Amino acid sequence: MKIRVGSRESKLAVKQSEIVIEAIRKYDPNIEIELVTMKTTGDIKLDQTLDKIGGKGLFIKELDQALYDDRVDITVHSFKDMPMAIDEYLPIVAVSKREDPRDVLVLPKTVKEPDFSKPIGCSSFRRKIQLQEIYPHCSVEPIRGNVLTRLEKLDRGEFSAITLALAGLKRLGLEERISRIFEVTEILPAACQGVIVVQARKGFDVSFLSDFHDKEAWDISMAERSFVRTLNGGCSSPVAAYGEIKDNYLTLTGLYVDSSNSVHKKTITGARKQGEEMGFNLALQMKGEDEVHGKD
């Protein structure tokens, strides 16, 4: 049996694919595996922010096509990069255990303390709006490119600091670059941040992923995505969600930024099995409160 694994060609994407490949080999060492890497539109168009050029789907478009063309059997993505609408013929078939979902501040290699004379580089409005509450006197500007490209821009002196996902730096073995870890109470992570997701063609036998799939990460991710979807959150939308499970209860925190850039945050707790419904209801509550306040 041979499995062809499709991946973006960035170092982090390949590392995440290798995590999936390792799980498949652990399940059955006799399975032959081929890693097929490719550039996506999102990797090529780096001169504009994602919301200006089509959103998160730009990171999966070419990989989806490779699945349709039978050039690969499964594809691997960061779940936070997945659009809300998933092709019914290319379903999500497994998710990884969640890596640390927090965001971090990274300084240039030779710098110990930030001076903020230059902007903080930031890839999303979600991070930007929360960073501005922590560093109100600092400028926050967009930065694009994969993790290593962003670090190069930082070390060249284009920014005083940049924000990244801790999970990516950890998977790349670059934890020493971290200057500050933001708690989820300071910067609420993107929905599904830290989770690796696998897609396949509908009906394709993915029993080799049975040990890889993490049910807790799945339940949390479904609740977080339900919240974002209900608020029509795209790649750079000022929307975030973070869930935790304890004793079969899910605690879900949502963040929503209204049209006047006011930040709304709310937390609810409910039964784990009702996660998607919780995400939907939390979004409606926050949207309703915003509309009520807007009429005052």
UniProtKB/Swiss-Prot annotation:
Top EC group: transferase
One function term, GO molecular function aspect: hydroxymethylbilane synthase activity
Pfam families linked: Porphobil_deam, Porphobil_deamC
Cofactor note: Binds 1 dipyrromethane group covalently.
Recorded catalytic activity of this chain's protein: 4 porphobilinogen + H2O = hydroxymethylbilane + 4 NH4(+)
Enzyme Commission (EC) number: 2.5.1.61
Biochemical pathway: Porphyrin-containing compound metabolism; protoporphyrin-IX biosynthesis; coproporphyrinogen-III from 5-aminolevulinate: step 2/4
GO biological process: protoporphyrinogen IX biosynthetic process
UniProt keyword terms in alphabetical order: Porphyrin biosynthesis, Transferase
Domain of life of the source: Bacteria
Swiss-Prot/TrEMBL cofactor(s): dipyrromethane
Keyword Transferase: yes
S-(dipyrrolylmethanemethyl)cysteine sites (modified residues): C235
One cellular component (GO) term of this entry: cytoplasm
Family: Belongs to the HMBS family.
Function: Tetrapolymerization of the monopyrrole PBG into the hydroxymethylbilane pre-uroporphyrinogen in several discrete steps.
Protein name, UniProt field: Porphobilinogen deaminase
